[in-house]
């Protein structure tokens, strides 16, 4: 499976040859200049890193890769995405072992991961989504291993991986929160003080290292970047309608960077403006139940109704180092793309169906619910789901969260096979005998 995932990702990247664009272009252009000790992107006349200083985490990764690999850096970053996709698959298999402890469930997890093409197609995107998620999932794996054997070195492994995940993508704070919740729940049962130590180390390293990277760039460039666009503005944006009624809460710079810059980058004034907006919007949603239901239902559907989670879109809307071939063009806007989307639609429905069955079995069986790790995958998913329900929405953010359903779907499928095995075999035998009888009568 891991070799298959790597090779498929490698082939797709070699075929598409995409280049950075939009945010990834701004970030990696900065990385290129930082690599030659040119800090022009951090000067006051260049807004990007003043608006989004948290992006300096991935810029730091890009700078290191560019310093080492030079002109091949963009492909190496895609290679890291491919390895991240491999890492996600490996972590999900590990979770299947830790949580369900059944060979059939593990085997079905591996089988279903063979069909999960969305993260593989997403590897062309020069951004920290996959890398951050993979590193953070492994941080959770190490947390679970620590809780299982109480060996404290796994606390350090977890803290290092979650810190690296947050550096690559700030959304990894969602998994840091899940790690803290799991450790607190275990502490309430066991009263192990090492859990509190683990939380402190993870939080300090997870948040502190990213801030340290920003600080070192400020020192190198002799500037002060400030906090950037206040996070409250992203909540304001996530609660607003957009010009497209089918995409409420999607990215709209009017509520974030445009407002921030219109107030001369005054963080307090921008935040206060956002809070006033949020209060008005919440008041309106509370007073109109129909509008509230329609807004959040439409926002949820707009994120989850794309079975590919924009994994082809992130390639098709960006430039390429070379003219793409006929197959890639067909994937972008032809029959190959239609077939791929139809397959992804079936696969997504299949996973959701059996993940639902798996959750029903988990809720019914007390012995499974007692497993300390049973809440891990649902907790991460719920954190991501709620975050994007209220903040910025886009299907591409869910390409990683979707994979969390796979081990649960494998468990659900395994349980269904065991429960209905005899009935299914009996039905097949009955149909076979009936068919045989008809053929004999016709003779």
Sequence positions of predicted segments:
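Membrane-proximal stem/loop segments at transmembrane-domain junctions that anchor or position
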Residues: 40-41, 218-322
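Extracytoplasmic catalytic/substrate-binding loops of multi-pass membrane glycan-assembly enzymes
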Residues: 16-32, 36-65, 71-72, 270-274
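Membrane-interface alpha helices of multi-pass inner-membrane proteins
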Residues: 154-169, 179, 202-206, 383
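Short acidic/glycine- and proline-prone juxtamembrane loop motifs at membrane-interface regions
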Residues: 121-132
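Membrane-interface anchor segments at the N-terminal boundary of transmembrane helices
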Residues: 75-76, 80-81, 298-381
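Transmembrane-helix signature of polytopic, membrane-embedded enzymes
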Residues: 92-115, 370-375
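Transmembrane-helix motifs of polytopic, lipid-linked glycan transferases
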Residues: 79-101, 138, 357
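Loop-to-helix entry region of an early transmembrane alpha helix in multi-pass inner-membrane enzymes
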Residues: 52, 56-60, 68-87, 341-345
């Amino acid at each position: 499976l891991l070799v298959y995932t790597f090779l498929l990702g490698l082939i797709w990247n070699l075929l598409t040859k995409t280049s950075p664009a939009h945010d990834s272009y701004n970030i990696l252009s900065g990385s290129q200049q930082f690599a030659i000790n040119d800090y022009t992107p951090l000067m006051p006349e260049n807004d990007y890193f003043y608006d989004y200083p948290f992006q300096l985490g991935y810029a730091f990764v890009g700078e290191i890769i560019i310093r080492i690999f030079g002109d091949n850096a963009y492909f190496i970053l895609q290679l890291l995405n491919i390895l991240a996709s491999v890492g996600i698959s490996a972590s999900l298999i590990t979770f299947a072992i830790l949580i369900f402890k059944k060979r059939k469930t593990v085997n079905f997890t591996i089988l279903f991961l063979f069909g999960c093409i969305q993260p593989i197609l997403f590897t062309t995107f020069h951004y920290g989504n996959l890398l951050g998620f993979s590193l953070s999932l492994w941080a959770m794996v190490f947390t679970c291993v620590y809780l299982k054997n109480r060996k404290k070195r796994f606390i350090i492994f977890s803290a290092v991986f979650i810190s690296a995940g947050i550096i690559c993508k700030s959304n990894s704070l969602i998994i840091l929160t899940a790690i803290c919740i799991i450790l607190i729940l275990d502490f309430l049962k066991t009263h192990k003080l090492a859990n509190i130590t683990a939380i402190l180390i993870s939080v300090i390293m997870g948040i502190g290292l990213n801030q340290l990277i920003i600080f070192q760039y400020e020192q190198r460039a002799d500037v002060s970047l400030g906090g950037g666009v206040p996070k409250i503005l992203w909540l304001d944006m996530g609660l607003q309608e957009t010009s497209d009624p089918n995409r409420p809460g999607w990215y709209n710079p009017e509520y974030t960077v445009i407002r921030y810059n219109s107030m001369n980058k005054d963080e307090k004034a921008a935040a206060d403006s956002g809070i006033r907006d949020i209060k008005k919007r919440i008041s309106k949603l509370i007073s109109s139940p129909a509008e509230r239901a329609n807004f959040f239902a439409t926002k949820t559907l707009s994120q989850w109704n794309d079975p590919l989670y924009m994994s082809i879109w992130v390639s098709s809307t960006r430039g390429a180092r070379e003219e793409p071939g006929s197959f890639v063009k067909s994937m972008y806007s032809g029959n190959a793309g239609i077939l791929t989307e139809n397959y992804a639609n079936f696969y997504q429905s299949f996973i959701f169906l059996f993940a639902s069955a798996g959750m029903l079995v988990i809720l019914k069986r007390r012995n499974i619910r007692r497993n300390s790790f049973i809440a891990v995958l649902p907790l991460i998913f719920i954190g991501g789901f709620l975050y994007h329900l209220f903040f910025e929405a886009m299907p591409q953010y869910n390409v990683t969260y979707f994979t969390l359903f796979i081990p649960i779907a494998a468990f659900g499928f395994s349980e269904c096979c065991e429960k209905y095995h005899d009935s299914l075999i009996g039905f097949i035998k009955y149909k076979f005998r009936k068919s045989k009888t008809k053929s004999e009568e016709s003779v």
